[in-house]
Amino acid sequence: MPTPLLTVRNLRVSFSREGKWNEAVHGIDLDVLAGRTLGLVGESGSGKSVSSLAVMRLLNGKVSRIAADSIQIEGKEIRDFSEDQMADVRGKCISMIFQEPMTSLNPVYKCGFQVSEMILQHEEVSKTEAKHRVINLFKQVMLPRPEAIYDSYPHELSGGQKQRVMIAMAIACNPKLLIADEPTTALDVTVQLEILKLLRKLQAETGMGMIFITHDLGVVAEIADDVAVMHNGEILERGTVQQILNHPQHPYTQGLLACRPPMDVRLKRLPIVKEFLDGQWQGGKEQILRDLQITEAGRKAHLEQLYSKTPLLKVENLKTWYPLRKGVFSRVYDHVKAVDDVSLEVYEGETLGLVGESGCGKTTLGRSILRLAEPTGGKVWFDGIEVTALKGQALRDFRKQAQIVFQDPYSSLNPRITIGEAIAEPMLVHDIQKDKKKCRAMVCDLLEQVGLHAEHYDRYPHEFSGGQRQRICIARALAVNPRLVICDESVSALDVSVQAQVLNLLNRLKEERNLTYIFISHDLSVVRFMSDRVLVMYNGKPVEMNDADELFEHPQNDYTKKLIAALPGIHPKA
């Protein structure tokens, strides 16, 4: 066997909290070979990122403690390297791409300067030579107009372009090992596929080894050769990507695979990881299909009943345009057509999926329906009432009937008030319950309904995980007993295991409360699981609308076909 690029033996990482040391990583072993990719998979908090940061010595030494029997790069022990020696290792031997490029790139410096800085730090070259190399790197990572991007600030680039700049920075000094920490999590499926293809291409050209950190086994299938599955700071299972994805042995791995919404069958609900750990699904996929699959006849009967009613929501030729201005007098010279002539109907009890890439107008459409963004033209009717004509108290009354769950639960919640007060606030604003004791009892009941507990009432948002915060936002949206709920990318920031729990919760609440959903997402597998019908948007316009199963199995529009083709599968790369 060839000497691994990276060898880690018995790595242990502890963090200090309130004077006590708590071990977060419990003695893991890692091997990464040249030209191969190790997929490091697990939920948030499993220790994936901490392990890689510990190898690179990037953890805060005041609050962390790293111990290992051995950490070797190409057979050279680096465990006892000084900080100066480690600074030389970083960038030249090991480099890292982080999850969020906007926070990794300095907003006050131009992109080209930041990548040049990496080269100048590690190599003795002139600034002119460094600039020339950066422009070539930008070409290598397939950035459009590399000279222009060299002189651009991070905020002027799209998410995918910023991630390409980060990749260029990471490979600037030809590292032997690249650590990619969730580099595609926040990206659209089409951009995600491009980044994965780019990383594979760069690996083929340079022969570098790679550690690819993710919570999504579908992404691992696209890029990894070997897989290690982490949970609570331990590696539970390891093997080739084919072994792990096709024949998972550990219940946790089986659960991670199963909680991803399937594209080939319809399920009443998604299995969750805890059920696998509790031994509930020992019969595997056959048992899941037997217990949870929705039959074609069952779905047909459901849809016939659904569409026999009159639509709850009607949107007719809706437009939301934003003016572009220039000159001293701010003359309007054009418009950004965020929503451009969209018509649709949503029936009571239906879930309409709304999909498209970032910037396609799906969020603006949702906000325009609720009048959170003012439409430029067109009409919206809700239960026979023209929403676009409402003002004052009538508009406030409509907002009791229609609510929204936003993408980022942390920024949706006021950090200064308890979550109980946050959920009670809309009840008080809309005069649903003025008695504080009764209001508190109603909030506690809502907390129980969304899978939290009454004792959580007096806690603050920062005390909860991402999945719990999203449950709080759902509870707040339900506080006014709405009939329509718009879910705007409400699970996109969550691990697949937590995502499954929230999707199951949304469907359960829909049945119990007879809710109607507009479900906005760029994740097509989630949209198919949730939706009865799907509308695909591109550049503000609707390009295809159909029954969800029909649209995914027989897409008509080329853009829809492109979105579906970009979906990461759970079948490993050849």
Predicted segments with their positions:
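Conserved ABC ATPase "signature" region
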Residues: 129-148, 386, 437-455, 564-565
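Conserved signature/switch motifs of ABC ATPase nucleotide-binding domains
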Residues: 91, 155, 172-173, 462, ...
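Conserved ABC ATPase signature
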Residues: 152-157, 161, 460-464, 468
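Short catalytic/signature loops enriched in Gly
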Residues: 4, 144-147, 241-313, 324-330, ...
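Conserved ABC transporter NBD signature motif
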Residues: 65-77, 378-386
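A short, proline-enriched helix->beta-strand linker immediately N-terminal to the Walker B motif
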Residues: 172-176, 479-483, 499
